[in-house]
Regions:
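Gly/Pro/Ser/Thr-rich low-complexity, intrinsically disordered segments predominantly at protein N-termini
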Residues: 1-223
């Protein structure tokens, strides 16, 4: 983990004040120990309204009934995403990797996850709103950021949330330990198969993707 990550706040005080200023009536926010929290239980409807009003620089999610803030991607994060897009286009030109995809996740679709990437057939999201149902999403993708919540969010909460709505594959590109982790075979809210691969080794993606990632380039983005 990058030095200082554990102490880094989720957002600057100025951004928090902007967010709190546009919060819907009845949604009370606070900044505690650098984390944004709601003072009262938050409904899905109130979250969606808050997210619509949030400043463009603030990326919000609703995970396990709680408000979460995603870190703004840095340069290496963006380069890794482009690498994945290129790999997908090379092997499966019928598919697209859609960035910053709002997904209805968790049991009963009560969660709202903003996936770094969602792999689906070209044109799949045409006509969709801000948050899409999981049907038709072949793979959810998360690229870890160097923030203190990434362990719980990307390694614990997201696999459960995506498996609960039967997304066939969850791909975690883990920048803390330079691995690519493939989760597959969702069943009863868990992925039955989890395979971890160091950067620089071939990574086989199971059906419905059914192609192999060349991860050698990822070593250029180790930090």
């Amino acid at each position: 983990m990058t030095p200082g990550t554990a102490e880094r706040p989720q957002m600057p005080v100025e951004d928090f004040e902007d967010l709190a200023g546009v919060a819907p009536e009845g949604v009370r926010l606070e900044l505690v120990d650098g984390r944004v929290r709601t003072k009262d239980p938050l409904s899905v409807e109130d979250f969606e309204e808050l997210e619509r009003r949030a400043p463009e620089t603030v990326r919000l999610e609703y995970i396990n009934g709680k408000l979460e803030v995603k870190a703004v991607p840095d340069g290496n994060h963006r380069e890794i995403f482009v690498w994945l897009q290129e790999q997908c286009m090379q092997h499966r030109p019928d598919l697209r990797v859609y960035g910053e995809s709002g997904v209805k996740a968790e049991a009963y679709r009560n969660g709202r996850a903003r996936a770094d990437g969602a792999v689906a057939r070209k044109g799949h999201f045409k006509g969709h709103g801000e948050w899409s149902a999981s049907e038709g999403i072949l793979m959810a993708v998360e690229i870890t950021s160097h923030d203190r919540d990434t362990d719980r969010r990307d390694r614990v909460d997201k696999p459960v949330g995506y498996a609960a709505v039967d997304i066939p594959v969850y791909l975690l590109i883990d920048r803390d330990n330079d691995t690519v982790v493939v989760h597959s075979e969702p069943e009863d809210g868990r992925y039955r198969q989890i395979a971890s691969h160091p950067w620089g080794t071939p990574v086989e993606l199971p059906a419905p993707l059914a192609f192999t990632l060349d991860t050698e380039e990822l070593k250029d983005y180790a930090d």
